[in-house]
Amino acid sequence: MLCRTILGECHAHRFGGVLADFEGGAREDRLPFLSRLGAMLTQSGRRLYVPERFAVPEASVLICTALSGGTLRERLSDAAARYGTQRVALDCQRLAMDFVLPCRSGEGTPLTPEELSARRERCGAAVFFSEELCANYFSYTAQGRAHFVLFDTAETLRCKLRLGRERGMETAFLMYPEVSDLLPELLNA
């Protein structure tokens, strides 16, 4: 019933697909639902997009581009090998994180655009570009601890989109609340 309702909404509003952006881990009940929904959407000429933890054969898989380790090129190549290039879509999450070093978990403290700006001004640190991560970074020391800050700009997001396109990945998602302040730069590129 729910799948038919979703399909009806897609038809009524001429949506080309559905993004199933669930929070949390992959629960048992969601995978059969997503398989059924994906099959129905495919039959109607539409696509289903799911986060990687919910990957089902009937859906395109969202690959997060906000990395703190490895390389984005490798990540996209691995995803293409695993799912097929045509099933990979980019989830261009805007990265802004402060990592206290050493950081074995790969998880930092998320920063709002205002916090990032204030931290950059306070530190006066030089900003560099990481080709491996397609992100900007700077480092600073506070209270005797080394910090490494990774962050995205319109330019780094365009770099991630370009890298995906070069690999045949034509679909990407940018969430409006994360990039609303960057839209003029993103759209006028």
Map each language-model feature to its residues:
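Acidic/aromatic/glycine-rich contiguous surface patches that form carbohydrate-binding/processing clefts
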Residues: 160-189
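Conserved, mostly hydrophobic/aromatic
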Residues: 20, 88-90, 164
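Short, acidic/polar
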Residues: 1-12, 72-75, 152-166
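Short acidic, glycine/proline-enriched helix-loop-strand junctions
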Residues: 28-32, 37-47, 129-137, 181-189
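Glycan-binding loop/region signatures in secreted carbohydrate-active enzymes
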Residues: 87-160
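Substrate-binding surface in catalytic domains of secreted glycosidases
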Residues: 27-120
